[in-house]
Amino acid sequence: MFQEAIARYLQSSGHSQIQLKSVLFDMDGVLFNSMPYHADAWHKVMERHDLHLSREEAYLHEGRTGAATINIVYQRQYGKDATPEMIKSIYAEKSAEFNSNPEPERMPGAWEVLQKIKEIGRAHV
């Protein structure tokens, strides 16, 4: 799958090869399996504010900003956006709840990929 995508890119761009200088990684869900902690934190904090967001639905908002997640739930229940003060307060609680968890486990294979990148002399960010 990746080989085909690379071949298409090389053909369409006119390049003969790809020479990576560095590799940029996202942490959550790529290097560390932190999404269960995010989902649990969102669920607990929303319930404290009488807002309904299941752990399962929290996964659907992965990658969305905290403010957007709060507003989606708030709009669904109340037909309007949450105030900036409410967003700040709810998101601060969610962050504190998330940070109370132990360090998440590495995603399978993440350490090996980082070691390979280091081995071939590429920077990782």
Which ranges hold each PLM region?
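Metal-dependent phosphoesterase signature
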Residues: 74-115
